[in-house]
Amino acid sequence: MEEKQFRDKVYWLTFLFSLLVVWVHSFNGELFMGTPEAALEVARIEHILGESLGQIAVPGFFMVSSYLFYRGFSWEKLIPKWRSRVRSLVLPYLLWNFLYYMGYVTATRLPGLAGVVGKSPVPFTGAGLFEALVCYAYNPVFWYLFQLILLVALAPLIYAVMRGNATGAAALGIMAWGLWMNRAMPVLNLDALFYFCTAAWVSLHRDTWGRKIEEKAGAGGNMAAAAFLLLAMVLLRYLGRPEGLLWARPLFTVCWRLWGVCAAVLAVKAAKLPAAREWMKHNFFLYAIHFAWVRLINKAAAVLFP
């Protein structure tokens, strides 16, 4: 497909993921339901919608970010791409974490807002500022950006491994084994590394076997891809059944969310969508502000309508 069409599809996809992130963080049944039985039923419905569908959003962001980073990548492009990510990731990460910290410092000292925020006065100290800026202490949804920054910093190592077919497949196999065994890594999440490396592997081979991602496909090609995804879903459900190979394994959750991302990519690619509007291109802003507003609206509504 043409470059403009590809970019429009990316904007549509990331906009969809942004809406799903808001959806996941909009759970509010426990704030309004008076009886435990009613609250439990509402929570069950919210869990089905949010956990089954909404949880593909962050893996999707990891994979889109990785695919774009390694699209047409070479060693000569490493420094320019790092410089670009400092502007688009690191600086906004620090700025928004600072704003959230100052917002909590201020709001917890205002009588009208302190009750809504539900925190004791947040101290303004050097240690607190460091925790807020670096460790996203007052902006929990930015764990994703923290992980993404780490992954971008590891770009040379990831590129060296994933640019080879055999080494890339072996690396993904090792990560899959680690997820199956429920292994953990210090600081970096293994599932985030798996999503990022999977997309990097495809992107680095977009001129060969990975070209199908960007190629136009007719009705027959889309139907074949949908049939493949359907078979993959059946296989995953079978392996994830009680006593199955993936039962109660983190690898099942990771594969299920990876399947969801693939389904979303196919849906956006196959759909005849109009050009992305300008406001749809500012997904970082929506991601940055949504959590505070969603929680503020929910808590304020719970106070006003007990």
Spans of model-derived segments:
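Alpha-helical transmembrane segments and terminal signal-anchor/GPI-anchor hydrophobic tails
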Residues: 194-198, 204-285, 291-306
